[in-house]
């Protein structure tokens, strides 16, 4: 059973992160950027972790990134990859790498976002080569 066959649980949402999942349903990857210091951050939150400002805003990300680190889980029923992906916007996301040969993964490879459906909720961003 591959990740595509395995049911992905729906993420827990709340009003603070709902715009992230609303955009995902439209095929857009969003990140928060601070209007005070200009730094992007992920996981989305109202207070900037860099300067403490509450002047954060949603910005559409390019969906392009680089594998910073990864691990292939080779457990039954099928292998899957977990990775930290450094986005072009400067934030790092913990995610899955999908739809590719897991043995071909390498740190530093370029990846792009894809959105995968969940059991009963919004799609979630994952990445592929």
Over which residues does each language-model region extend?
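Short, conserved beta-turn/loop elements at beta-strand boundaries and strand-helix junctions
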Residues: 71-78, 116-118
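A broadly conserved sequence feature marking short terminus-proximal activation segments
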Residues: 1-29, 129
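Short, cysteine/histidine-rich loop/knuckle motifs that typically chelate Zn2+
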Residues: 33-36, 47-53
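Short, acidic/hydrophobic/Gly-rich beta-strand patch recurrent on exposed beta strands
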Residues: 82-88, 94-96, 126-128
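Short coil-to-beta-strand transition motifs
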Residues: 57-64, 104-109
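Residues immediately within or flanking Cys/His clusters that coordinate Zn2+
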Residues: 28-31, 45
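Well-ordered alpha/beta subsegment
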Residues: 2-3, 96-129
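Short functional micro-motifs and their immediate structural scaffolds
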Residues: 42, 55-57, 75
């Amino acid at each position: 059973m591959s990740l595509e066959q395995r049911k992905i649980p729906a993420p827990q949402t709340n009003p603070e992160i709902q715009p992230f999942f609303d955009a995902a349903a439209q095929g857009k990857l969003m990140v928060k950027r601070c209007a005070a210091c200009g730094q992007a951050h992920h996981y989305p939150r109202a207070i900037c972790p860099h300067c403490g400002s509450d002047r954060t805003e949603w910005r559409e990300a390019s969906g392009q990134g680089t594998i910073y680190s990864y691990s292939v889980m080779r457990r039954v029923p099928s292998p899957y990859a977990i990775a930290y992906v450094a986005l072009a916007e400067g934030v790092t996301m913990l995610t899955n790498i999908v739809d590719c040969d897991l043995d071909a993964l390498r740190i530093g490879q370029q990846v792009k976002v894809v959105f995968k459906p969940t059991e009963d909720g919004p799609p979630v961003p994952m990445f592929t080569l």
